[in-house]
Amino acid sequence: MLRSVATIHSFGISVMGGFIIGFDADPPEIFDLQEQFIEEAGIAVAMIGLLSAPPHTPLWKRLEKEGRILGLPSGNNSMDENALNFIPRLERDFLVTGYKELLRKLYTPEASFGRIRKCLEHYKTPDFVAKRPVKLYDIKAMFLLLWTLGICMEGRLAFWKLFFYIVFKKPAALPEMLHLAAMVHHCQIVTKAFLRRENSSPT
């Protein structure tokens, strides 16, 4: 699987991934296993969700027979612990706590910008990308991104390490690096807001 992801990256396609936690077959170390795979594969944008059992699906019917359904799902299985609308095999508090910790680890600046570097180590600018002249708004967007991530953001040192690595080692990948950095920054903001909201919620 790691080789397959690297091959896709080598064709100039950045892989994004969606991952689900909460299956009956998940072992207690599922959080470490997912983190290890995402980091080693260099999947910059990784969306992690908790398993939901939608009504009228085979999963719902099986869990209903087993007496494990708790109610309707929230409708959002990403960054919402209420998505877990059934009794999981792993203890629920253990599952939710591990889920939050996995999100926290994945979107630290060091981890997330490190995955961009890992992705772009194999990256080859595709030949089919249309060449166009640089516009004024391109320059404005780049400087806004550099200001936001390189000056205002906590963990900006990790961003500058990535930036200068790309400038000197993989300059053709700079546009893709900036694109991925912007997406990752959005994920960092959303993840922080989720964890802050959950930590402030009454238990």
Regions found by a protein language model. Give the residues of each.
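Terminal low-complexity segments of carbohydrate-biosynthetic enzymes
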Residues: 121-122, 129-203
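A structural motif corresponding to the C-terminal lobe/cap of the Radical SAM core domain
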Residues: 1-138, 142, 149
